[in-house]
Each structure stands twice: as C-alpha cells, then as structure tokens.
Amino acid sequence: MSEELLSFEPATGEQLWRGKVSDVDAEVEIARRAWPEWAAKPVTFRTETLRRFADRVKAESEAFADLIARETGKPLWEARTEVESVANKVDISVKAYAERTPNRRIEGAMGLRSAVRHKPHGALAVLGPYNFPAHLPNGHIVPALIAGNSVVFKPSEKTPAVGAKLVELLHSAGVPQEVLRLVVGGPDTGKALAAHPGIDGLLFTGSARTGLALNRQFAGQPGKMLALEMGGNNPIVAWDTADIRTAAILIVQSAFLSAGQRCSNARRLIVKDSLADALIAEVRELANRLIVDHPHADPAPYMGPVIDNEAADGLTESFLVLMSNGGQVIRHMTRPVAGRPFLTPGIIDVTTMAERPDVELFGPLLQVIRVETFEAAIAEANNTAFGLSAALIGGTPQLYDQFWANARAGVINWNRPTNGASSAAPFGGVGLSGNHRPSAFYAADYCAYPVASAESDALRASIGVGLRDPEGSQLVTKKYL
C-alpha cells in the first residue's frame, strides 16, 4: 500500500485531507521534459494563462478561503485576504517581469547591435510554508511560470490540502499538468526534492534552520538558483509619541496578527524607558481584548490557533524559559482550549535578562526591552543575526532617517506595523533572514537569468594589426575584411 499523508484542522483536530506521498523522481522527470515547450510559448500566452488562473481564484474565492481557514486555523476574514493576494499576484508579477527582466536592444554603427534578453532556469522546485500556504508559494510559482520555467511544488506537510487546491486552480486555468507538478510528502520528501539532480533551482520560504541546511547543500552547486526567505527576530521600536493608543494598536498588530505566525511579525518591543509604563499598559489592555477562537466563530476572532499542538507546546515552553531566566511577565500566555493549539497573547519584559535568545519564536509572544537612548534602541534592534523587518513607532523625521540608515533589515517601516508588506515592493532580508534574493516584486529576478548578446545581420570582421602580407615579406597594417 502506498504511503499516505494526512492533514488535520488545528481548531478541531478533525481529519481534513489525505493523499498519497509522491514519487519525487517521477515528478521531476515530468517537469524537466515539459519546460522547453512551455518556455517556447510567447510570454503573452503564459501571462494570459495565468490571468485565467486569477479569474478562477476569484470565482472560487469563498470555498478557497474556507479551506485555508480550516487547514491553518487562521480566521476566515484573514483567509479571505490571502485568497485576494493570490489573485492579485498575477498582475503584479506580469508588471514585475516586464520591469525587472525586460528585453533591451541597443543599435550601433554599420548594422551592429547589442541586446539583453532573459531565459528561464528550467525546472524549479518550490517548497511552501504552512502559515500562508497559498499566497507565499504562489509568489514563487506565478513569476516562475511567467518566465517560462516548469515548477515542482511541495506544500508544507501541515497544509497539503491548500497546496493541492492551488495546483488544481492553476491546471484548470490552462497551465499544463506536466509543467506544474504537485509533490506530496513530509520532510524526507522535501529533502529528496531539494537534493534532486534534475532541478535547476529551489525557491524556499520557511525556517532559518531549514534554509541554512539548504544553503549548505547548494553551496557546491553554483549553477543552481537558490532563493531563501527565512523569517526574523523582528524589532519594533517605540519612541516619543503622545498618541499612546495608536502606538499600542500598531504594536499589537505587529506582534499578534496571524497568531504571531508571520515571518514579519514583531518579536521584540524596544521602548523608551520614560514611555514604557504607559505604553505597555495600553498594549496589555488591548491584548486582553483580542478574541482567540475557531476560525469560523461569531463574533470573528482576531486570532485562531497556531498550526498544531507541537508548535503550541514549544511556544509555551519558550515562555517558561524566558520567565525562569529573569523575564518579568506582563501578560501570561495560556492554552484556553484543552488539547488544541489555541494560545492567548503572551507579553514578557526581558530587559534584565543577561542573555536573550536570538531565535524566531513563531507565535503570539512579545518580548519587551526598555532602553534609555535612541542609539541604544538601534543597537538593540540590530542585536540579532536576523534582518527581515523593523519598524519605528513615533519619533521625528530626523529620528526615522537615523533609524532607516542604521537598522539592519530588508523591510524598514515608520508608524506602520512590521508586517503587511506590499507585493508591489521587494520582500526579503539579510543575515539569517535570507540570501539576498528578495521575493514579491523582485521574484522576477530569480526566475530568469540575463543573456547579453552582440549581434549583426551580416558577417563583418577585420584584423587590423599583426598580419604578414600575402607574400610573407613584411608586416602590414591594412585591414583584411
């Protein structure tokens, strides 16, 4: 009997989906054979095919959102925004392909010209995460297909149903089944796909641990594209502001949206000491009011569960470790539903901790650090090996200029949350957050490579110096055409 993969709803524990584990060798071989024909299609054909995909997503938006909500546990309202992002990605990617990888031709004298064009890599593997199981892999798949690549897509083993639905919608729009392949399986299947000699590159969104392993694996293969987006230990700095209420809202959005399961969520609140008491009280009061419930509950929750009990257990343990090492609890993280991975927002002051762990705590847990000076705030913001997202709340234009110039991150915001980045801009980080292959609008860059050409419609050449004359008696300088 073939091995199977099962998927369960985080909110209820009920089985949602089951499917057979894929044969990686077979799927890669199919994609490799298919990509030359797909690449040979005009780009207008490929883009129109994907525009039909966007229409299919819109036509099935409510059912798709319901599936995302059930398999991830995120509130239905949030799942709807994810579906909207999936549909919107097509037009954004078409524009990005035209702007980031244009064909250019420069005419020269005597019929000579130079040109720059772009080619697809071939068969690309995509490894998707569970937190945005449609939007984030779609952000790799759509630009890869527009550029003329074939794709072998492995969704997270925690959200295979959404991945399968995404592929179904792409196929129904006219993307050939051979060009886009779905690989179902667990971590071993992902490792087999990443190591497969038949792929020409891998596009990854996930944890730093997995991303670092992939980086080591691909280090000896410079001919293969590797694009990594690996999360962050993101700081949000709160400075001089009289609008404590709005500042608190921005902080809560940054820390607890998606139950803290966004790579761009704030993990650390760095706050001016003289502002801290009033601001923290407002943040705690607002966090107390957040509804944590089933994704389809009425009234609608702000947060659903985290992805599974293993994740919830790890976050609870991390909160206890921070407490035992000197952290002062501002708001306890609790498990309100026995046996299910619901977590209430946790807030803890770690200012006096001698050594704070530099890890991505992927859930609704916010650490508070008090500082005296703005220079200390920037130093604390940069006190991490990650570098994805950072935000300044309050301050002045001059302070923001200082923050922007010195904060080490790929996304730097002012008076906006750390999360909710626009797909019309690049999205990526430095350090342990990525390998300088930003996604979103810049995904086009890693889906094709540039080819420079010198061209002439007719044979035209000369050797101007260093030739003997035909009799071999002397050197001549005249040109032989």
Curated annotation (Swiss-Prot):
It is an enzyme of class 1 (oxidoreductase). PANTHER family: ALDEHYDE DEHYDROGENASE-RELATED. CDD domains: ALDH_SGSD_AstD. Belongs to the aldehyde dehydrogenase family. AstD subfamily. Catalyzes the NAD-dependent reduction of succinylglutamate semialdehyde into succinylglutamate. This is N-succinylglutamate 5-semialdehyde dehydrogenase. InterPro entries: Ald_DH/histidinol_DH, Ald_DH_C, Ald_DH_CS_CYS, Ald_DH_CS_GLU, Ald_DH_N, Aldehyde_DH_dom, SuccinylGlu_semiald_DH_AstD. It catalyses: N-succinyl-L-glutamate 5-semialdehyde + NAD(+) + H2O = N-succinyl-L-glutamate + NADH + 2 H(+). Coiled coil: none annotated. Pathway: Amino-acid degradation; L-arginine degradation via AST pathway; L-glutamate and succinate from L-arginine: step 4/5. GO terms for molecular function: succinylglutamate-semialdehyde dehydrogenase activity. NAD(+) binds at G206, S207, A208, R209, T210, G211. Transmembrane segments: none annotated. The gene is astD. Its EC number is 1.2.1.71. Keywords: Arginine metabolism, NAD, Oxidoreductase. GO terms for biological process: arginine catabolic process to glutamate; arginine catabolic process to succinate. The active site is at E229, C263.
